[in-house]
Amino acid sequence: MKTTLALLACLCALALAAVEPIPAFTPNERVLFQGDSITDGNRGRSADPNHILGHGYAFIIAARHGAGFPERKLDFTNRGVSGNTVLDLEKRWAKDTLALKPDLLSVMIGVNDHSRNVPLEAYEATYDKLLTDARAQNPKLKLVLIEPFVRHPGKPVPEGIVARQAIVAKLALKHGAALVKLQKVFDDAAAKTADDYWVWDTVHPTYRGHQLLADEWERVVREYWK
């Protein structure tokens, strides 16, 4: 039993040692994840620390870097809300984003805007305003924008999603944000196995898919702020 515990401790230590620091994560920073259900990840709505970050990519990133670099005293917060469009996000932006005063803000929004036919013009204008307001509050704010994506086996990506991906890329360039492009990541992964291995309902990642998302997020953010 003691040998097994010692082995597990060694494996955990090796896993943490393999984590590379992200330059964008400076000591005492608050990292805020915003978005819809993919970000929400069934997060807790109370102070219970067991579930406060949810069970998705935000949790993976926070756990890896919170445990890997405790001396940095990073604060990871998740305010994703299942079902949100950018119009819903606008209604709670002051309370759930600006009031939290993040140092790094990551946003993933758009798939519900597509399914609910939010006009592209409204999607872009509202998203742009939210980012402008966040930057006005903190000129040094680091922004990460994650493009919406879907997986429809054997079908092309819907035009509405493609259009929103282009808008997110445009806004990332305008606001000096790191851009996390997921469509190709999941398309490439799906080419190696069944779609539902990564995304179980064309929209929501499985735990494996969340790991893919977290890995790509970290890769892009690490590269953007070297």
Question: Where are the predicted features?
Answer:
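Positively charged n-region of N-terminal signal peptides that target proteins for export
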Residues: 1-4
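Bacterial N-terminal signal peptides
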Residues: 6-15
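A short, compositionally biased domain-edge/stem linker segment
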Residues: 14-24
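Alpha-helical cap/lid subdomain in secreted, periplasmic
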Residues: 22-27, 55, 59-75, 84, ...
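Short glycine-rich His-centered loop
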Residues: 23-51
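Active-site beta-alpha turn of Rossmann-fold NAD(P)-dependent dehydrogenases/reductases
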Residues: 35, 80, 147
